[in-house]
């Protein structure tokens, strides 16, 4: 329990510091299965946005950590408004049980990102129509 609280407190401290330095939360949600949690934020200085989604459970084989990643790898997916999406190296969590649930069949839009969720997967794209599809069994980028 102490470890979980430390992770939550460190994550909240990170986001509080980030927001104080010119970032603003532009939206968040979780899937009805509570397996995927997503958040997007805007850099008010650079006028760009970023989005990340984190999975709780994956049944597919997770790629090995990149050589430059000594933290957790494989369960976090991120992208900017433009360009490719990728798996992330991270040492905290974005999962928050208080995120609003995005119901199956519904679409979420914010900051140039569009996500839709079905019973089979979550699909998110950016302004370039690049992004990812996530499910327990398959995580793919396009």
Where are these regions (language model features)?
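Acidic, glycine-rich flexible loop segments
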Residues: 90-125
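Positively charged n-region of N-terminal signal peptides that target proteins for export
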Residues: 1-4
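Extracellular glycan/ECM-engagement signal in secreted proteins
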Residues: 116-142
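Bacterial N-terminal signal peptides
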Residues: 6-15
């Amino acid at each position: 329990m102490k470890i979980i609280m430390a992770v939550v407190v460190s994550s909240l401290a990170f986001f509080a510091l980030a927001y104080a330095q010119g970032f603003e939360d532009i939206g968040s949600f979780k899937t009805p299965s509570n397996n995927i949690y997503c958040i997007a934020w805007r850099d008010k200085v650079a006028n760009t946005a970023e989005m990340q989604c984190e999975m709780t459970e994956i049944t597919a084989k997770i790629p090995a950590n990149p050589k430059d990643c000594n933290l957790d790898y494989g369960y976090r997916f991120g992208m900017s408004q433009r360009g490719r999406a990728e798996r992330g190296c991270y040492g905290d969590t974005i999962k928050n049980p208080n995120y609003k649930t995005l119901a199956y069949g519904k679409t979420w839009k914010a900051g140039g990102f569009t996500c839709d969720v079905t019973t089979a997967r979550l699909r998110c794209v950016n302004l370039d129509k690049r992004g990812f599809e996530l499910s327990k069994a398959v995580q793919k980028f396009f």
